[in-house]
């Protein structure tokens, strides 16, 4: 089922890219494997999937212990500072939403002697439950720090669209992030990645310039909540 789902999804991504004149190779498909076991991840690996996303730092840690660097790991969930020591095992951290968190990631990355790829999470909707940087001034402050930190490689921005059926609100959330990214790039920053789009809204995200899609249920099916 997982292999079939991946093929259907890749075909759909190709179709949307053709429609909006984009190269499908410019988009990373991140399979969000939270609450799924190593066996399901291995099925996806056998189907050619190499990018995986985890929302919980300790779940990432336990899966990394089993699979290691066979795959590329993306930490995409809300990150508490006391869990950074686990999250820095990932190749990418998408959810940097404060200066103090960026500083903590820098500290751990320096200790490990690694350059940590990160994205700054921006709040582009009014939903209280959504995390992310609010306000351009705060965003510039964090981006400036990350751009100058010795062990951080700031590669882009991330957002989560509002949970709504109103497509205009979803599109605005994504286009706002793209415009912020363009503005930062015009000021000398080099941010190539836009992490936006999940199972319910990835088509709009591609149309608005997403380069990283975070997709779970369209690949693995509905989540089964169990422990590893």
Which ranges hold each PLM region?
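Conserved alpha/beta-domain cores
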Residues: 1-200, 208
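Expand to "…catalyze enediolate/carbanion chemistry for C-C bond making/breaking, isomerization
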Residues: 206-207, 219-227
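A short hydrophobic/small-residue beta-strand
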Residues: 51, 212-213, 219
